[in-house]
Amino acid sequence: MIMSKEKLIKSIREIPDFPIPGILFYDVTTLFKDSERLQELSDIMYEMYKDKGITKVVGIESRGFIMGPILATRLGAGFIPIRKPGKLPAETMEESYDKEYGKDTVQIHKDALNENDVVLLHDDLLATGGTMKAACNLVKKLYPKKVYVNFIIELKELNGKQVFENDQDVDIQSVLSL
């Protein structure tokens, strides 16, 4: 059964005032709890990247750890986690970035990627783009051949793609736009 993108969008739970008042939170976990929705999402993303030569899928903590390994398996690629500081056991590299309420940092193992890798960076949602931009900068420090960026959802009104306007070598796509 092929499910439309509209049906996928309708199945996303909206939670007002989470995590703080005034924020409308889009809960993508509703896409994962039903096998048909999960399969459809997996199929759509596989079709987007099946001919790109992806060698590593890099998922951002924590919801990038759900679809990231599924995509890696479907694409015949390895999976690499990007995590918060202190969570990876071997030698790491890090990138710090500003958030609306402070600073944050992401890390990757120094030996996670090399110049022969074609990378698909994945996270669940593109809002302002800060986390993914930091992750992209971090991945680029390991000199992969090409970097693709993928989101399940892009919140268009927040213009998160703007932080990538100087990264014309980065291909950015989302499955669903809200």
UniProtKB/Swiss-Prot annotation:
CDD domains: PRTases_typeI (cd06223)
PANTHER family, per the entry: ADENINE PHOSPHORIBOSYLTRANSFERASE (PTHR32315:SF3)
Main function: Catalyzes a salvage reaction resulting in the formation of AMP, that is energically less costly than de novo synthesis.
UniProt cross-references to InterPro entries, sorted A to Z: Ade_phspho_trans (IPR005764), PRibTrfase_dom (IPR000836), PRTase-like (IPR029057), UPRTase/APRTase (IPR050054)
Enzyme class, spelled out: transferase
Family to which the UniProt record says this protein belongs: Belongs to the purine/pyrimidine phosphoribosyltransferase family.
Catalytic activity: AMP + diphosphate = 5-phospho-alpha-D-ribose 1-diphosphate + adenine
Assembly and binders: Homodimer.
GO cellular component terms, A-Z: cytoplasm
SUPFAM superfamilies given in the database record: PRTase-like
Pathway connected to this protein: Purine metabolism; AMP biosynthesis via salvage pathway; AMP from adenine: step 1/1
MF-aspect GO terms: adenine binding; adenine phosphoribosyltransferase activity; AMP binding
GO BP terms, alphabetized: adenine salvage; AMP salvage; purine ribonucleoside salvage
Alphabetical keyword list: Cytoplasm, Glycosyltransferase, Purine salvage, Transferase
Protein's UniProt keywords contain Glycoprotein: no
Chief place of localization: cytoplasm
Subcellular location: Cytoplasm
EC number of the protein: 2.4.2.7
Segments forming a coiled coil: none
Superkingdom of origin organism: Bacteria
Name by which UniProt lists this protein: Adenine phosphoribosyltransferase
